[in-house]
A protein has these predicted regions:
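Hydrophobic beta-strand residues in large extracellular and virion-surface proteins
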Residues: 47-49, 59-61, 68-72, 164, ...
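Feature activates predominantly on carbohydrate-active enzymes
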Residues: 28, 66-243, 268-272, 351-358
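Residues in well-ordered beta-strands of folded domains
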Residues: 50, 62, 128-130, 245, ...
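Substrate-binding groove of N-acetylhexosamine-processing glycoside hydrolases
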Residues: 21, 43, 113, 228-231, ...
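Acidic, contiguous N-terminal accessory segments
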Residues: 6, 16-78, 90, 111-113
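Short, solvent-exposed loop/turn elements at domain surfaces
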Residues: 57-58, 134-138, 317-318
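A generic structural motif
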Residues: 17-18, 40-54, 96-106, 195-199, ...
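Sec-dependent N-terminal signal peptides
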Residues: 3-12
Length: 622
């Protein structure tokens, strides 16, 4: 008996802990169900659920009158996702954290008596919130507007996601920790693993770093600072994993041996607390050692406790033949890296649905290739059996909720990795959308029109190391060959532009119209270069460009007025926060700043990188 008792108490204790966790989760889920019922205008307690542990993730919809009981069986870590899979089968949709689509009771009853299996494509699936950019999540997670963060955490759970991380910064650090506590507590209760994104020695964009720059470069006190700041973070925040930059910036490396040492120390320190380290593996170039090779792939030599986040940028993916970003031909080397390391350590693929830096939602351009490329990458990686899919996002306004939602939906194997999963659920005309996707893929991506209709940033204009391969406006102005080539390509694309008037969602339709108007605007800007500075012909061409801009502005005004879901975050305003930027993430989109800048540059023939520049380069660096 004395040998049995310890095992009895051990089992009882573990069982009691699991029961308490379930009771806590049950209360939170009931609260969320009440919130969903209220929004749907259903009677209270129309929805209920029961849970039992099992090896297969299933949910059975049992109905009694107008009441629905979701009978959930699953492995423990999929209980929340399996439950919300039941709501999905009833017809509840959550395209955006502040947008719920509810079924009628009659439609929901079509699921009665049926059993559905939840089949996730990846064990871990979720989003990195890039709060180094001045988006809604800066206010929500880091600056105390907790309702924004709580809505987002619920959106993750409702869309069957189970990982999230947030970039933390140096300014007002204590306030950030306080602001993170409530949403991180809710995420934990819902079974969502929570991470913090930071740098070992990252200097750019106010990022929090574990080692001060001097110590990182000199090696003096680097390990002491590293351990001290890991402890500081652990003492102030309950989190599950850390994602770490290993260079001083995305484009500049630190000493290779030191960097390996920092990774190994960090992984070991985190492991003591039951936490996990992942390192970001960028696609930037020109960081190569004869001994160690590509600095971005250096973590392959670290302890196997160090996980990987292989990154791709913008609307390019692992299987694209051409990905002219950061001096690359494509990202085939990143796919090879994944395949070589997959059996050795944890890997979460780390792509994007919004780049933000003058390229997509802040232009604004609604780039539908994000739907195509993310679906293709997920489908390609599923047979590789990688552990996770971790999508980088810079915000969901200006229609970019569509791309994040499609990624979340495609974590469900039943969706078959379709680029149209979200649009189908929205009841859109799929034939029309296929023509839109095919058109943008051909012209914007394959024929590289994106380099013409997006905008050069400060780095593009002051150096030859371009973010995206492009001709700057100065180069177009100085070369008639370049100018006429770009004019010809724009005219060809405009001639084949599909009619988007049949798009049902107003926000998406307006953004597609704005995107098409940008083609016309870019064309007129280039046509104006054919004529002398003060000629009437140039003035007429620039007037035409202005006219297209004003047409776009009319549509943007409707979007900012009727489809602004975070008014307190002031995303469309000129304002500051703890990031390196002096404006909300969508101020340039709301004002069409970049469009006006191009017109003014031609009018004045002023191509100075700092002309009408809104980014403080020193703030970005320091």
């Amino acid at each position: 008996m004395k040998f049995i008792l310890p095992f009895f108490f051990l089992f009882s204790s573990a069982f009691a802990t699991e029961v308490r966790r379930w009771e806590g989760l049950e209360a939170i889920l009931n609260e969320d169900f009440q919130r969903i019922e209220k929004h749907a205008k259903w009677a209270p307690r129309t929805l209920s659920f029961e849970y039992a542990r099992a090896e297969e993730n299933t949910v059975t919809i049992n109905c009694e009158g107008l009441n629905f009981k979701l009978q959930v069986t699953s492995v423990p870590h999929e209980k929340t996702s399996t439950l919300y899979h039941g709501l999905f089968q009833l017809g509840f949709l959550f395209p955006h954290p502040r947008w719920q689509i509810s079924p009628s009771l009659d439609k929901a009853q079509l699921a009665c008596g049926k059993t559905f299996t939840w089949r996730p494509a990846f064990p871990y699936r979720g989003f990195h919130l890039h709060t180094l950019h001045p988006n809604e999540w800066v206010q929500g997670f880091l600056e105390g507007q907790t309702d924004i963060a709580m809505d987002y955490v619920r959106w993750l759970a409702r869309n069957r996601q189970n990982i999230v991380d947030v970039s933390i910064m140096r300014p007002k650090w204590e306030g950030q920790m306080a602001s993170l506590k409530a949403p991180f507590a809710l995420a934990k209760a819902l079974g969502i693993s929570r991470g913090v994104s930071l740098g070992a020695a990252l200097q750019q964009q106010n990022s929090f770093r574990l080692i001060p720059l001097f110590s990182a470069v000199s090696g003096i006190g680097d390990e002491k600072h590293l351990r001290k700041n890991i402890k500081k973070l652990n003492d102030n925040l309950d989190y599950d994993f850390m994602t770490m930059e290993i260079g001083t910036s995305e484009f500049t490396s630190t000493d290779y041996e030191k960097s390996l040492n920092w990774m190994n120390i960090t992984a070991a320190e985190l492991s003591k607390e039951g936490k996990k380290l992942f390192t970001k593996n960028h696609v930037s170039t020109n960081q190569v050692s004869k001994k160690w090779g590509n600095f971005n792939l250096l973590p392959r030599y670290a302890s196997q406790d160090v996980g990987l986040l292989p990154h791709t940028v913008m609307f390019y993916g692992l299987y694209d033949e051409n990905a002219p970003m950061y001096g690359n031909k494509n990202f085939a080397h990143m796919l090879k890296f994944i395949q070589e390391e997959n059996d050795k350590r944890d890997i979460w693929y780390y792509p994007e649905t919004s780049y933000w830096v003058f390229m997509d939602q802040d232009a604004p351009l609604l780039l539908t290739d994000y739907l195509k490329v993310r679906a293709k990458d997920m489908e390609g990686l599923y047979p590789e059996k990688i552990e996770g899919h971790f999508n980088f996002t810079s915000g969901q306004e200006m229609g970019y909720w569509l791309f994040d939602w499609n990624v979340a939906l495609n974590a469900d194997l039943d969706m078959e990795f379709s680029p149209l999963s979200a649009l189908k659920l929205l009841g859109e005309d799929l034939n029309l959308w296929e023509s839109i996707l095919d058109y943008q893929n051909e012209h914007f991506k394959e024929k590289s029109l994106i380099s013409i209709i997006s905008f050069s940033n400060l780095q593009d204009e002051i150096s030859k190391h371009r973010i995206h391969h492009r001709n700057t406006l100065k180069e177009v102005f100085r070369s008639s060959l370049i100018r006429e080539d770009e004019i010809q390509r724009l005219e060809a694309a405009i001639a084949q532009s599909p009619d988007v008037s049949g798009v049902k969602n107003e926000e998406l339709r307006l953004l597609l119209e704005v995107t098409n108007l940008r083609l016309h605007h870019a064309l007129e800007v280039r046509k104006s270069m054919r004529f002398k500075k003060k000629s009437s012909d140039r003035a007429l061409a620039l007037k035409a460009a202005e006219s297209f801009r004003m047409e776009a502005q009319t549509r943007v005004n409707v979007i900012t007025k009727s489809h602004s879901r975070y008014p307190t975050a002031r995303l469309f305003d000129w304002r500051s926060d703890i990031t390196s930027y002096s404006f909300g993430s969508l101020w340039t989109a709301a004002t069409l700043h970049h469009w006006k800048r191009e017109e003014r540059m031609i009018t004045r023939e002023n191509f100075n990188p700092f002309f009408d520049n809104i980014v403080n380069f020193m703030d970005i660096i320091f």
